[in-house]
């Protein structure tokens, strides 16, 4: 099995613009958000569409949508993972 190439099209990141553009440069689908409502709509939509195997969400955005994060933990796919923002981990 060749593990030297990862299909980054199956990975998404949601967070403030400064963080997601760095991930976008690595080939991930980037979804910059600037409000809790926008984050809720974006993350819920990504989960519902099931087009990405892993959805990374910055910690600061995750704190704004704990209900969506909790709901996502009840299902196997896609995986939702919190990551530090450009300001670092909390």
Cite the ranges covered by each PLM segment.
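Short, surface-exposed connector motifs at secondary-structure boundaries
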Residues: 1-2, 26, 50-52
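N-terminal first-folded block
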Residues: 4-40
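Short coil/turn connectors at secondary-structure junctions
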Residues: 8-9, 51-52, 76-78
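Short secondary-structure boundary segments
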Residues: 35, 58-60, 84
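Acidic, metal-coordinating helix/loop segments flanking the phosphotransfer/catalytic sites
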Residues: 41-48
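Periplasmic-binding protein-like
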Residues: 53-57
């Amino acid at each position: 099995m060749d593990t030297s190439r990862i299909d980054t099209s199956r990975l998404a990141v949601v967070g403030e613009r400064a963080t997601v553009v760095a991930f976008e440069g690595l080939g991930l689908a980037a979804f910059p958000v600037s409000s809790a409502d926008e984050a809720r709509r974006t993350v819920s939509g990504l989960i519902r569409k099931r087009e990405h195997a892993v959805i990374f969400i910055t910690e600061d955005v995750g704190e704004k949508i704990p209900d969506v994060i909790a709901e996502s933990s009840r299902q196997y796919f896609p995986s939702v993972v919190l990551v530090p923002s450009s300001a670092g981990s909390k």
